[in-house]
């Protein structure tokens, strides 16, 4: 599997364009649901060395546990710039933010103890490739902790999501009809838990680990 330069460039440009308004666009759902889900996910992080894929504007930064070293990466420099501002609001001595493509990470094999991502693999151009890279850079037995929105379980809703997915992707750079649980397994992760968080299981929490 290789990176698709055209799709990767499109995604980077789309999120750089959206960066200025991104937090405002998600303000409502962030306050109602996402914030609570993020906090609960990060409470389960053990570390000590953690990779956050797709740090975005830094919405997870307030929940970084003080006992771990978090390295956050993002594809879009304007999103990362906002995350750097958020990093200044916490004790950031144990953390780092880097501009990097999740599909081609510069880290050595088995660098991290855990990988965290929240609402990211809906926009990675090749999600299986990105998840394979995550598997490569985590230690044997290391965990993947995810929040993600994906293709709904009810057939009628799934068909509707699939129908509008191309338009949503063009406007927002995100896919809303991906079978993300299948992608995690296809990348080589062993799935431990999938927890539906909303109607139709559109939003789910996924916990998986790398085989020893």
Task: List the model feature ranges, each with a label.
Residues 103-115:
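A short acidic, Gly/Pro-enriched loop at the edge of an enzyme's catalytic core
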Residues 128-140:
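A short glycine-rich, Lys/Arg-flanked "PGG" loop and its adjoining helix->strand segment in the class I
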Residues 1-20:
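N-terminal, positively charged/glycine-rich alpha-helical extensions of SAM-dependent methyltransferases
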Residues 49-104:
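Class I SAM-dependent methyltransferase SAM/SAH-binding core
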